[in-house]
C-alpha cells in the first residue's frame, strides 16, 4: 500500500509584484539580521536541536512486535502524579491543600444580551461580557463537597450512575469533583447528542438523577424525559426554567444551589460518605462515535490518573502562572483530561465557548472583547477542525492584504520556517509580523495541544509559525483515557503525534489485509496497540465489543486494539498513516485509504470539509464536499455561473469546476489515479455536530453521511 501524503510542509509562494530593488533590500536586511544573531542563537539552538533530534522512545526488546516506551519510562510506566494520590478525590484534596486560596475556575459575567438583525434578515444573539469572576481551590472544594452531600441526600448511592448533560462551564467541573469525592459514577453526554442517543445512554445506565442546564432542559431533555422511566431528579446548574407543568409526574427539578444548600446543612450533621478505590469507575463516557449509537466507555480513577500523569510530563514548567481556556466539550476525554492536568498543578481555568472564544466570534458584539482577549491564556487545546478554520481565516486575510504587506508576510513566514528547522527563534518576526495573528488567541499562548483527529502538516506548521509557540499534537482514545502520545515542545517536526507517554507503551501488530507489517523497512508499521494503566475497563454492558477491542497479556497488562495504523520513526515517534475502517477495496482490487484522500484535499481554500466514499462494487472514488462560500462564489463569478448559494451547490457545472480544482490538488499531493475522486456532490449546508454528520471532535460520521447522501451516491455511481 502507499503511504500517506508527505507531511513535509512547503514554503509559501512569493507573488512577484514587489519592486525588485525593494525585495533585494529586504533580503539583505534578513541576511544581515541572521548574521548578527547567529552567535547568540547558536548556543540556544544547539541545545534545542539536540533535544529535537534525540531518541524519544525505544523498543523494550529486539523482537519485531516489541512495545515502544518513552526513554523516561524504560524501567517502569508512571501511574500516579503524587505519592499516595491514587484516586481523583485525593488528587483534588492534594491540590486544594497546596493551592488553597489560588484562583481555579473563572466565568465571565453576562453584562448585556441583545438581538442583532443580519443583512439576510436572520436574528443573531449577541452578548457583551464582563471580567472573569473566579472561584478559589477552597471555594470549588467546598461547593463540590456540599453538592455531593446534597446528591446523597436525594438518594444517590455510591457506585451508582448519575448523568451530566451540560455545556462546558465551571459547574460541570464542580459536579464532576463532587461525584469523584462521593464515588458516584459520572455518566457524561455530549450537549450536541440527538434525542435517541440521549435516551439510549440514560436508559442503558439506569440513571435516576441528571445534571443539566436550563437551556438543554428546555431544548432537548423536556421532550424525552417521558422516555426515561427511572429518572427522578433533574438538577439545573443555572436556575429553574419558567414552567414545570409539562414534566411527567414523579420528576422533581432542583437548582444546583438548592442541592448545595441541602448538602451544606446535612454536612453539619457529619454525614459519612463512601471513598472510591483506584479500581472504581470514575466516568462512563459516552462517545459520539462515528458509527451507530454511542458506546459508554468505563474509565476508572486509576485510568484517568495514569493518563494525566503522562500528559503533565510533556508540558514543561506547568504551574501557577499558567492559564488554560476551557471551551471544548468536557464530555470529550481530551478536554476533561486537560482540565484535570491543570487543576492538579495550580493552573487557572477560564471558561469559554466556540461562540465567544475570540473578538470575531459569532456571539460577541462588535467592538467588545472575546474570551481569549480577556483571559490571555497560556495553554489551549483544540481539535484540528478549529485549527484548520483559524488557518483558512488568517490566509483569507493575507490574500486581502496589499501586495507589499502580503509579500512581507510571506517572506517572514518562509524565513521563520527555515529558522525553526534549525532550532532558532525569530523575535523580530514574532514582534512585528506575527503579533497581530498571535493576538487572536490573546497573545500569551505558549503551548497549543491538538488532539481528537489527525492535524495536517500545513496547519501544524502555520500554527507553530504564526502563533509563535509549539503545537503538541497528541494521539489517544476515550478507551485509553485520552492518553497515548504527545509530541515534545522542542520537536518541530510535523505530521507525527510524538513518542509514547511515560504512562503507557505502544506496539504495532501486523495487518496482512492492509499490507502493513512490523518488519517493514525502513520503518515498522502496523495496527497500534496501547498498553498500560491508561487502558480502560471496556464498554458498559457490551461484553462482545469489549472482548473484540481489549485483551490482557500473559503478565496481566491490559491492551487496547485501536484500529489505527501507525509507523515508528527512528527517534521513536509515532506517525498515524491509516485506519482499518477507512480502507476500502475497489472493484478492480486496489485499496483506497479514504482518510488519505481527505487529508490531501481538506486544506484547499475552496474546501471547508470533505468526505471521500468508495465501495467494492465500483471502480472509482466519489466525494461529498462542503465548499467555502466565499471561494465558491468567486469561482462561479470567474466561470460566469450565476444563482443562489443552493443553486450553485446543486449545479452540475459547478460540481465539474470544483472537481477540476480537487483533481489538480490530488495530483500535486501525489495521489494515485484510482484515489482521486471522479464525481462529487456539493453540500450547501455545513456539517456540524448538531447535524449528526460529524462528532463533537468534528470527525466524520461515515455511516450517517452515507445515509444522508444515499440518493447522491446512487446518482454518482448510476443506479443498479
From Swiss-Prot:
Listed under GO biological process in this entry are:
long-chain fatty acid metabolic process; long-chain fatty-acyl-CoA metabolic process; neuron differentiation
Entry GO CC = endoplasmic reticulum membrane; lipid droplet; mitochondrial outer membrane; peroxisomal membrane; plasma membrane
Query: Which sequence ranges are marked TM in the entry?
Result: 21-41
Report the coiled-coil segments.
Answer: none
For this protein, the record's Gene3D superfamilies field holds: N-terminal domain of ligase-like
Q: Does the keyword Endoplasmic reticulum apply?
A: yes
Which residues are exposed on the Cytoplasmic face of the membrane? 42-720
Q: Which InterPro entries match?
A: AMP-binding_CS, AMP-dep_synth/lig_dom, ANL_N_sf
UniProt keyword Transcription, yes or no? no
What GO annotations for molecular function exist for this entry? Answer: arachidonate-CoA ligase activity; ATP binding; long-chain fatty acid-CoA ligase activity; medium-chain fatty acid-CoA ligase activity
Known function: Acyl-CoA synthetases (ACSL) activates long-chain fatty acids for both synthesis of cellular lipids, and degradation via beta-oxidation. ACSL3 is required for the incorporation of fatty acids into phosphatidylcholine, the major phospholipid located on the surface of VLDL (very low density lipoproteins). Has mainly an anabolic role in energy metabolism. Mediates hepatic lipogenesis. Preferentially uses myristate, laurate, arachidonate and eicosapentaenoate as substrates. Both isoforms exhibit the same level of activity.
Family note:
Belongs to the ATP-dependent AMP-binding enzyme family.
What protein name applies here? Fatty acid CoA ligase Acsl3
Which species is this record about? Pongo abelii (Sumatran orangutan)
Taxonomic lineage from the root: Eukaryota, Metazoa, Chordata, Craniata, Vertebrata
